Every structure is written in C-alpha cells, then in structure tokens.
Amino acid sequence: MSERKRELAEEASSTSFSPLKKTKLNDSSDSSPDSHDVIVFAVSSSSVASSAALASDECSVTIGGEESDQSSSISSGCFTSESKEIAKNSSSFGVDLEDHQIETETETSTFITSNFRKETSPVSEGLGETTTEMESSSATKRKQPGVRKTPTAAEIEDLFSELESQDDKKKQFIEKYNFDIVNDEPLEGRYKWDRL
C-alpha cells in the first residue's frame, strides 16, 4: 500500500465522528496494478461518504441521505485530476465529510424514497458494490384474506328495519316541526320559519 493510502487510513482511524465504521474493500491483492484499495466511511448523520484512495484510475461513491433513511440519494463517479488535487491538498480530507465534498465530472444519481437496507455480498464487496433491497413493511401489515361471511336473514332484516325507522323519524320530524330536513326547506304548518 502506498504511503498516501496509509496516511488516509491513519487519518480516517483518528477521526472523532461518533459512530464511524471503516471497511477496506478488495483486500486480496495489493501488488496487482488493477487492484483498487477503497476505504469506506459510514457516518450516521445527514451525509455519508465513501472515498477511493487517490490512484489514477479509481472511482468514488458518495451516499447521502437522512438519518431516518426515509429518502436517500446514491451517486457515483470517477475522480478528475482536479478533484484529486483538491483532495491531496486538503488537510482534513476524510475527516470533515460535509465541508469538503468532492464534485465529479460524471455523476449518476438514483433517488429512493422508501425505507431500504444496504447489503453486500462477498462478491460485491470485492467489486466495491452495495445493493439496496426494499424493506417490506407492508408485508408485515398484510392481513390474511378472511372468509367472507354471508349475513343471515335476521341481520338483513335488522338492517332494513333500521333504515325504515330512520325514514319514520324523518317523517315524524317533518310533521312535528313542518321543516323538510332532506331538502332544507320550511313547510307550511304549525310553525313559521324565517331565514336568518
């Protein structure tokens, strides 16, 4: 591992963020020219970032979202020579993730507006990939389809008798107060209704 990569790893391990998780991906071969050492920082705040060690052809992944994981955006892209220079010159690279975020030339964004959980498989860890799977909160809330109960004749009769009694109550009100509550009109009779 190069000296700069060691410095980044030491600087990352000495940070003061409360829940900080450091994971090294693709650990299998340091001597291969195609291998990439990637250090991933996961901080539970409103901004989470992972940055690649500064090699000529490596890429970075930046993940930003809310603590509640209700919405999240995932973006990735390759470093440009300018952004590598900014990162090398910055004394707090990897320490203050919110103040020194690196802009990239190519960026792909995906917005997820549901609860999700990040999972990595051994193969995807080697490739530096993280997959997201939707948590099924609706699966736990699903009700088992019940057997439809056919109402008995007595229940049907009770329903219709209630409806008839409501009609009877309306008629009684109309006769007593000479006011049609259905059409909201005064009727001729015992009382005289004046509009206010």
UniProtKB/Swiss-Prot annotation:
One Pfam family from the record: CDI
Activity regulation (UniProt): Down-regulated by KIN10 under a phosphorylation-dependent manner.
Consequence when changing residue 152 to A: Abolishes its phosphorylation
GO cellular component: male germ cell nucleus; nucleoplasm
Compartment annotation: Nucleus, Nucleoplasm
Annotated segments matching region Disordered: 1-36, 55-151
Keyword Nucleus: yes
Entry's Gene Ontology molecular function annotations: cyclin-dependent protein serine/threonine kinase inhibitor activity; kinase binding
Superkingdom of this protein's organism: Eukaryota
Principal location: nucleus
Similarity field: Belongs to the CDI family. ICK/KRP subfamily.
Role of this protein: Binds and inhibits CYCD2-1/CDKA-1 complex kinase activity. Regulates cell division which is crucial for plant growth, development and morphogenesis. May inhibit CDK kinases specifically involved in the G1/S phase transition.
The protein's name in its UniProt record: Cyclin-dependent kinase inhibitor 6
Gene source species: Arabidopsis thaliana
Gene symbol of the encoding locus: KRP6
